[in-house]
Amino acid sequence: MRRGVEEAEIDRLPIDLLAHIFSLITCFRDLAQASRVCRKWKQGVEESLARREKLSFSGWKMDDESTTRLVFLAYSLKELDISRSRWGCQITDYGLHQLSTAKCIGNLSSFSLWGSTGITDKGVIQLISRATSLEHLNIGGTFITDASLFAIADSCPRLKSLVLWGCRQVTEDGLRTVVNKCRKLESINVWGMRVPLNCFTALLTIRPALQIEPKGVVTVVLNENRFPIWPIY
Protein backbone atom coordinates (compact mmCIF):
# COMPACT_ATOMS: atom_id res chain seq x y z
CA MET A 1 0.00 0.00 0.00
CA ARG A 2 2.83 2.33 0.86
CA ARG A 3 4.36 1.83 -2.56
CA GLY A 4 1.09 2.76 -4.21
CA VAL A 5 0.95 5.99 -2.19
CA GLU A 6 4.48 6.92 -3.29
CA GLU A 7 3.63 6.32 -6.92
CA ALA A 8 0.52 8.47 -6.58
CA GLU A 9 2.60 11.31 -5.12
CA ILE A 10 5.01 11.08 -8.04
CA ASP A 11 2.13 11.10 -10.47
CA ARG A 12 0.85 14.34 -8.96
CA LEU A 13 4.02 16.25 -9.84
CA PRO A 14 3.27 18.47 -12.86
CA ILE A 15 5.37 17.97 -15.97
CA ASP A 16 6.65 21.57 -15.82
CA LEU A 17 8.04 20.98 -12.34
CA LEU A 18 9.63 17.69 -13.34
CA ALA A 19 11.20 19.32 -16.39
CA HIS A 20 12.60 22.14 -14.23
CA ILE A 21 14.08 19.65 -11.75
CA PHE A 22 15.66 17.58 -14.51
CA SER A 23 17.09 20.72 -16.12
CA LEU A 24 19.27 21.14 -13.02
CA ILE A 25 20.88 17.73 -13.57
CA THR A 26 24.15 17.94 -15.52
CA CYS A 27 24.97 14.24 -15.53
CA PHE A 28 23.58 12.61 -18.66
CA ARG A 29 23.83 9.20 -17.05
CA ASP A 30 21.49 10.36 -14.28
CA LEU A 31 19.07 11.78 -16.83
CA ALA A 32 19.06 8.49 -18.70
CA GLN A 33 18.27 6.62 -15.50
CA ALA A 34 15.52 9.08 -14.57
CA SER A 35 13.88 8.65 -17.96
CA ARG A 36 13.49 4.94 -17.24
CA VAL A 37 11.56 5.41 -13.97
CA CYS A 38 8.19 5.86 -15.65
CA ARG A 39 6.57 7.36 -18.71
CA LYS A 40 5.94 10.68 -16.99
CA TRP A 41 9.55 11.03 -15.91
CA LYS A 42 10.68 10.24 -19.43
CA GLN A 43 8.45 13.04 -20.68
CA GLY A 44 9.90 15.36 -18.03
CA VAL A 45 13.46 14.54 -19.09
CA GLU A 46 12.62 15.17 -22.75
CA GLU A 47 10.98 18.51 -21.96
CA SER A 48 13.95 19.56 -19.85
CA LEU A 49 16.24 18.89 -22.80
CA ALA A 50 13.91 20.77 -25.13
CA ARG A 51 14.33 23.89 -22.94
CA ARG A 52 18.11 23.82 -22.70
CA GLU A 53 20.09 26.46 -24.55
CA LYS A 54 23.48 24.95 -23.69
CA LEU A 55 24.78 21.38 -23.90
CA SER A 56 28.33 20.23 -23.23
CA PHE A 57 29.48 16.65 -23.72
CA SER A 58 33.09 17.54 -22.95
CA GLY A 59 34.31 15.06 -20.36
CA TRP A 60 31.69 12.45 -21.22
CA LYS A 61 32.25 9.29 -23.22
CA MET A 62 29.80 9.91 -26.03
CA ASP A 63 29.44 8.46 -29.50
CA ASP A 64 27.51 9.41 -32.62
CA GLU A 65 24.30 7.73 -31.50
CA SER A 66 24.13 9.06 -27.94
CA THR A 67 25.14 12.57 -28.99
CA THR A 68 22.60 12.90 -31.78
CA ARG A 69 19.83 11.39 -29.66
CA LEU A 70 20.22 14.13 -27.04
CA VAL A 71 20.74 16.98 -29.49
CA PHE A 72 17.62 15.99 -31.42
CA LEU A 73 15.60 16.61 -28.24
CA ALA A 74 17.22 19.99 -27.53
CA TYR A 75 15.05 22.15 -29.77
CA SER A 76 16.10 25.45 -28.11
CA LEU A 77 19.82 24.76 -28.19
CA LYS A 78 22.11 27.74 -28.87
CA GLU A 79 25.49 26.47 -27.63
CA LEU A 80 26.86 22.97 -28.24
CA ASP A 81 30.20 21.61 -27.04
CA ILE A 82 31.27 18.14 -28.12
CA SER A 83 34.98 18.66 -27.56
CA ARG A 84 37.06 15.55 -27.17
CA SER A 85 38.35 15.06 -23.62
CA ARG A 86 40.49 12.52 -21.82
CA TRP A 87 37.56 10.10 -21.89
CA GLY A 88 36.94 10.89 -25.53
CA CYS A 89 33.90 12.17 -27.34
CA GLN A 90 33.97 9.80 -30.28
CA ILE A 91 32.08 11.83 -32.84
CA THR A 92 32.62 10.98 -36.51
CA ASP A 93 31.52 12.29 -39.90
CA TYR A 94 28.42 10.11 -39.60
CA GLY A 95 27.53 11.85 -36.35
CA LEU A 96 28.02 15.30 -37.89
CA HIS A 97 25.80 14.30 -40.80
CA GLN A 98 23.09 13.24 -38.37
CA LEU A 99 23.49 16.41 -36.30
CA SER A 100 23.08 18.54 -39.42
CA THR A 101 19.45 17.38 -39.61
CA ALA A 102 18.59 18.38 -36.02
CA LYS A 103 16.06 21.23 -35.68
CA CYS A 104 18.36 23.30 -33.46
CA ILE A 105 21.39 23.37 -35.76
CA GLY A 106 20.25 26.39 -37.74
CA ASN A 107 19.96 28.40 -34.50
CA LEU A 108 23.31 27.47 -32.96
CA SER A 109 25.45 30.49 -32.12
CA SER A 110 28.36 28.55 -30.59
CA PHE A 111 29.79 25.16 -31.52
CA SER A 112 32.95 23.38 -30.41
CA LEU A 113 34.48 20.31 -32.04
CA TRP A 114 37.88 20.81 -30.43
CA GLY A 115 40.10 17.75 -30.66
CA SER A 116 37.57 15.61 -32.53
CA THR A 117 40.11 13.66 -34.55
CA GLY A 118 37.49 11.31 -35.99
CA ILE A 119 35.99 13.99 -38.23
CA THR A 120 37.05 15.16 -41.68
CA ASP A 121 36.10 17.91 -44.11
CA LYS A 122 33.18 15.80 -45.32
CA GLY A 123 31.38 15.88 -41.99
CA VAL A 124 32.28 19.48 -41.16
CA ILE A 125 31.06 20.78 -44.51
CA GLN A 126 27.76 18.91 -44.16
CA LEU A 127 27.11 20.40 -40.72
CA ILE A 128 28.38 23.91 -41.44
CA SER A 129 26.07 24.20 -44.44
CA ARG A 130 23.14 24.08 -41.98
CA ALA A 131 24.70 25.98 -39.05
CA THR A 132 24.32 29.39 -40.65
CA SER A 133 23.84 31.35 -37.40
CA LEU A 134 27.21 30.48 -35.88
CA GLU A 135 29.09 33.29 -34.15
CA HIS A 136 31.72 31.21 -32.35
CA LEU A 137 33.32 28.08 -33.81
CA ASN A 138 36.11 25.94 -32.37
CA ILE A 139 37.49 23.26 -34.69
CA GLY A 140 41.00 23.29 -33.29
CA GLY A 141 42.92 20.04 -32.93
CA THR A 142 41.23 18.43 -35.93
CA PHE A 143 42.49 17.35 -39.35
CA ILE A 144 40.39 19.70 -41.45
CA THR A 145 41.77 21.37 -44.56
CA ASP A 146 40.98 24.51 -46.54
CA ALA A 147 37.82 22.80 -47.83
CA SER A 148 36.18 23.24 -44.42
CA LEU A 149 37.25 26.88 -44.24
CA PHE A 150 35.78 27.57 -47.66
CA ALA A 151 32.48 26.13 -46.42
CA ILE A 152 32.65 28.26 -43.27
CA ALA A 153 33.32 31.36 -45.36
CA ASP A 154 30.26 30.66 -47.51
CA SER A 155 27.85 29.58 -44.77
CA CYS A 156 28.69 31.58 -41.62
CA PRO A 157 28.24 35.32 -42.26
CA ARG A 158 27.77 36.04 -38.53
CA LEU A 159 31.01 34.39 -37.40
CA LYS A 160 32.89 36.44 -34.79
CA SER A 161 35.52 34.03 -33.47
CA LEU A 162 37.24 31.02 -34.99
CA VAL A 163 39.66 28.64 -33.28
CA LEU A 164 41.97 26.71 -35.61
CA TRP A 165 44.48 25.68 -32.95
CA GLY A 166 46.79 23.03 -34.38
CA CYS A 167 44.97 22.70 -37.72
CA ARG A 168 48.19 22.07 -39.58
CA GLN A 169 46.62 21.15 -42.90
CA VAL A 170 44.99 24.56 -43.31
CA THR A 171 46.88 26.92 -45.62
CA GLU A 172 47.04 30.63 -46.36
CA ASP A 173 44.26 30.33 -48.94
CA GLY A 174 41.79 29.03 -46.38
CA LEU A 175 42.65 31.72 -43.84
CA ARG A 176 42.42 34.55 -46.35
CA THR A 177 39.08 33.31 -47.65
CA VAL A 178 37.53 33.16 -44.17
CA VAL A 179 38.80 36.58 -43.14
CA ASN A 180 37.71 38.10 -46.43
CA LYS A 181 34.18 36.65 -46.47
CA CYS A 182 33.30 36.52 -42.76
CA ARG A 183 33.06 40.27 -42.35
CA LYS A 184 32.06 40.15 -38.68
CA LEU A 185 35.08 38.07 -37.70
CA GLU A 186 36.81 39.61 -34.68
CA SER A 187 39.34 36.98 -33.59
CA ILE A 188 41.08 33.91 -34.94
CA ASN A 189 43.36 31.45 -33.12
CA VAL A 190 46.16 30.16 -35.35
CA TRP A 191 48.43 28.58 -32.73
CA GLY A 192 50.43 25.63 -34.08
CA MET A 193 49.53 26.16 -37.73
CA ARG A 194 52.08 25.81 -40.52
CA VAL A 195 51.71 29.12 -42.30
CA PRO A 196 54.28 31.87 -42.94
CA LEU A 197 54.17 35.18 -41.10
CA ASN A 198 53.41 37.15 -44.24
CA CYS A 199 50.06 35.35 -44.28
CA PHE A 200 49.11 37.15 -41.06
CA THR A 201 50.24 40.42 -42.57
CA ALA A 202 47.76 39.77 -45.38
CA LEU A 203 45.00 39.00 -42.88
CA LEU A 204 45.60 42.27 -41.04
CA THR A 205 45.57 44.10 -44.35
CA ILE A 206 42.12 42.68 -45.06
CA ARG A 207 40.86 43.37 -41.52
CA PRO A 208 43.15 45.65 -39.44
CA ALA A 209 41.10 45.19 -36.24
CA LEU A 210 41.32 41.39 -36.38
CA GLN A 211 42.68 39.83 -33.18
CA ILE A 212 45.13 37.08 -34.06
CA GLU A 213 45.82 34.61 -31.26
CA PRO A 214 48.28 34.01 -29.72
CA LYS A 215 48.88 37.72 -29.26
CA GLY A 216 52.63 37.40 -29.81
CA VAL A 217 52.06 36.63 -33.48
CA VAL A 218 51.05 40.21 -34.26
CA THR A 219 54.13 41.59 -32.52
CA VAL A 220 56.39 39.33 -34.55
CA VAL A 221 54.55 40.19 -37.75
CA LEU A 222 55.14 43.88 -37.16
CA ASN A 223 58.83 43.48 -36.38
CA GLU A 224 60.13 40.55 -38.40
CA ASN A 225 59.82 39.06 -41.84
CA ARG A 226 60.50 35.40 -41.27
CA PHE A 227 58.69 32.11 -40.73
CA PRO A 228 57.53 31.36 -37.19
CA ILE A 229 58.92 28.38 -35.39
CA TRP A 230 55.78 26.69 -34.13
CA PRO A 231 55.90 23.99 -31.46
CA ILE A 232 55.71 20.42 -32.74
CA TYR A 233 53.15 18.15 -31.11
For the regions a protein language model found, what residue spans apply to each?
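N-terminal adaptor-interaction module of cullin-RING ubiquitin ligase components
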Residues: 1-93
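Residues that line or immediately flank small-molecule/substrate-binding pockets and catalytic motifs
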Residues: 25, 59, 84, 115, ...
